Amino acid sequence: MNGFHSFSSAAFFAKNPGRKLTMSLPDIYCTVISALQWRKNGNSITMLTDSAGAELFSALGINDIWNDIKVVIPDDLDGIDPVMFWAGGKLIALQQFPAPCAMIDTDFIVWEDPSFEDKIIAAHEEDLMPSVYPDVSSFRLKGKVLDEGLDYTTLPLNTAFLYIPDEDFKQYYTSRSIAFMKSAVYGGDYLTYMVFAEQRLLPMLAKRCGIGYTTLLDKDRLFLPQSRYTHLWGAKQKMRDDKAQLDKFCERCRERIRKSYPEYEYIIGNIERAEK
C-alpha cells in the first residue's frame, strides 16, 4: 500500500517568527519508527512537506527512512490560517496524493497492516463532546461551504491513520475540508474548527455518498494495551514535562531501530549529531 507522512512548518513559523525550525527528539524518533515499520510491512511511504520541512529532514539526516520526499505543501498553506488550522497541510497533502492511499501521522505506528479493501479506514471514532465538537451553528464562516444533507449526529473519525480507497471521494472530502478552512473566521476555540474540518466532515461526507467506513481501534478501548497499532500522541504530551521519561523513551526508540531495522542504525548517529 502507498502511504504518506506529512509535515507543514507554517504553524511553527506563525507562532515563532524568526526562529529556526526544530523538531523534538521524541517526534523525530516516532517519525523514524513509523516510516520504517510501514516499509517493513511491505509498503511504500512518501514524506509530503513544504520547503522548510524538506531542509529540516535533510539536516537531520533522515531522508532515507522514506521512499521519497516531495515538496507539495505551500509554505503559506495557500491562504489557510496556520494557527487556526495547524494540520491544514495534512489535508492539502492528502488532496495531492493519489488513492488508494494511507495517510499516517508521524506518531502513529502500524505494526500489522489492516485489510485494505473498499471501505475507508480511520484510526478510531470519537465521542461528540460539545467542548470539542460544538453545534455547527457556532462556526463563523464566509459564504455557504457546508453541503446539505449532512448528518450531524455522526461520530467523528480520528485521522491519525486514514485509508481512502477511492480518488473521487478523496477529492470531494479534501475540497470540502479545504473550503471550510479557507472560509472560517475566528470566533472561538481553534481546536473546534480544526477537528471539524479534519475529523467531523469525513464520516458525514462518506455517509452522504453512501461509502462505508471502519476503524482500526475501538474508541472505548483506546487506553488498553494494543499490539497492532500504537498512537504516541498522549505519551509525547507527558514527555514534554518529564525529561527522565523523555530520555528513557528515546533510548527505547534507539533500541527498537537497532533490533528491528538494523540496516538503518546509521540514522541514529545522524540524528544525534544533528541534535548536538
Predicted features by range, described:
Residues 1-77, 233-276:
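N-terminal anchoring/stem segment of glycosyltransferases
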Residues 16, 56-60, 113-115, 201-205:
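A short acidic (Asp/Glu
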Residues 26-28, 33-34, 75-104:
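A conserved donor-nucleotide-binding helix/loop in the catalytic core
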Residues 44-45, 101, 211-214:
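Hydrophobic anchor at the start of a short beta-strand
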Residues 50-55, 105-112, 219-220:
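Short, polar loop motifs at secondary-structure junctions
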Residues 89-130:
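GT-A fold catalytic core of metal-dependent nucleotide-sugar glycosyltransferases
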Residues 115-182:
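Conserved catalytic core of nucleotide-sugar-dependent glycosyltransferases
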Residues 152-240:
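Catalytic core and acceptor-binding pocket of nucleotide-sugar-dependent glycosyltransferases
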